[in-house]
Regions:
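Cytosolic, long alpha-helical scaffolding segments
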Residues: 1-211
Length: 211
């Protein structure tokens, strides 16, 4: 008689979906921070709460995976992939919060067009990430999400370059250039982490198909 496979731990799938929603919320808050400077302080507090929530979700996933929580069933995919996906999702929120924190730390008083546009790219990529994470339940192949996130990542690269180039072209204070370069880099790192998530999910889907 063949051995019966344990059922998948639905709690882990729920936590990944929760992480996707948190990634979306963090990206929306950052976009609003870059678009609405007078209301930046309360948005920054909410973004910090997202970062703390991301840490809590990551902690719960790892504890559940290690058998330290109320795990019921086997992981939905290989443990190494669970760890890497958890870490990278947390990175997205960390980079978003780092960007928001830099806006306050550097005393940025006015938005840059390219930074606002790059935050919109992050919102789009985060939406695709959240959609893909919901697809873990159904065994989706994530191809459409990977293509769109890759397109958005390329757009983010262009906006980053254009933003930094415009700073040098206008001859602003070198300290302002350094501060905005730092902001652009953390913003783009958040978008890059979205693409990493997409590649991880594609790899998970491939392993599933190979059985």
């Amino acid at each position: 008689m063949p051995l019966l496979r344990r059922r998948v731990d639905e709690g882990l799938l729920e936590l990944f979906e929760e992480s996707g929603r948190n990634v979306q919320r963090a990206s929306l808050l950052l976009r609003d921070m870059l678009s609405d400077f007078p209301e930046r302080a309360p948005l920054a507090r909410d973004l910090l709460l997202c970062e703390q929530e991301g840490d809590r979700i990551a902690h719960d996933i790892i504890h559940r995976l290690n058998g330290e929580g109320p795990r019921r069933g086997r992981p939905p995919f290989e443990s190494a992939d669970v760890y890497e996906l958890t870490r990278t999702l947390d990175d997205i929120v960390d980079f978003a919060e780092q960007t928001g924190d830099s806006l306050g730390l550097y005393g940025v008083e006015a938005p840059m067009e390219q930074a606002v546009a790059l935050s919109e790219v992050l919102v789009g990529a985060s939406e695709e990430v959240a959609h893909a994470l919901r697809g873990l339940r159904t065994g989706a192949d994530f191809a459409a999400q990977l293509i769109e996130i890759h397109r958005l990542e390329n757009e983010g690269d262009r906006l980053h370059r254009d933003g930094v180039a415009s700073l040098f072209a206008t001859g602003v204070d070198p300290m302002i250039v350094i501060r905005w370069k730092d902001i652009f880099e953390s913003l783009e790192s958040a978008v890059d982490a979205c693409e990493t998530v997409a590649h991880l999910l594609e790899g998970i889907a491939l392993k599933r198909r190979r059985g």
